UniProtKB/Swiss-Prot annotation:
Top-rank lineage group of the source organism: Bacteria
Classification via PANTHER family: UPF0114 PROTEIN YQHA
Compartments, record wording: Cell membrane
Record key words, sorted: Cell membrane, Membrane, Transmembrane, Transmembrane helix
UniProt protein name: UPF0114 protein YqhA
Any GO CC annotation of this UniProt entry: plasma membrane
Bilayer topology annotation: Multi-pass membrane protein
Transmembrane segments: 10-32, 53-75, 136-155
Family stated for the protein in its record: Belongs to the UPF0114 family.
Classification via Pfam families: UPF0114
């Protein structure tokens, strides 16, 4: 009975495979939105004010960072929790595949969230005259919470690795 339960539990990891595949569909949706934004801005690029163009560019950078985060979570999560990715010899392989454990993935996700939050906060500050002060305050508080969380996770990881 114990062996049966263990085998079922171990096989249940494959329930995550469609979730990771769903992230690839989310990446397609993000890419479509990215190019929609490019197609929207290009015809009007000469009519846009510099600040408005910078806001659009920050939005594109933000989407790019989110896309990188999706790829990192999708591949590393699949490799850590479902199965090793078997990339054919001779095909291009990302050099970090198979080298990122759950802890390093968590730290990279935290760093990515801080970067995404920084870009978002910069976009908000570029339009600060149209954002109420209390909303600005909450954006900063939330961003600082992300920064502090990432710092604490990195510090705890360093302590854990140092003690082992």
């Amino acid at each position: 009975m114990e062996r049966f339960l263990e085998n079922v539990m171990y096989a249940s990891r494959w329930l995550l495979a469609p979730v990771y595949f769903g992230l690839s569909l989310a990446l397609i949706a993000l890419a479509l939105k990215f190019f929609q934004e490019i197609l929207h801005v290009l015809p009007n690029v000469f009519a846009l004010a510099e600040a408005d163009l910078i806001l659009v560019l920050l939005s594109l950078v933000d989407m790019t960072l989110v896309g990188g985060l999706l790829v990192m979570v999708m591949f590393s999560g699949y490799e850590n929790f479902v199965s090793q990715l078997d990339i054919s010899a001779g095909k291009e392989k990302l050099n970090w595949l198979g080298k990122m454990d759950a802890t390093s993935l968590k730290n990279k996700v935290a760093a990515s969230i801080v970067a995404i939050s920084s870009i978002h906060l910069l976009r908000v500050f570029m339009d600060a005259k149209n954002v109420p002060d209390n909303k600005l305050m909450w954006y900063v508080i939330i961003h600082l919470t992300f920064v502090l969380s990432a710092f604490v996770m990195g510090y705890l990881d360093r302590l854990t690795r140092h003690n082992h």
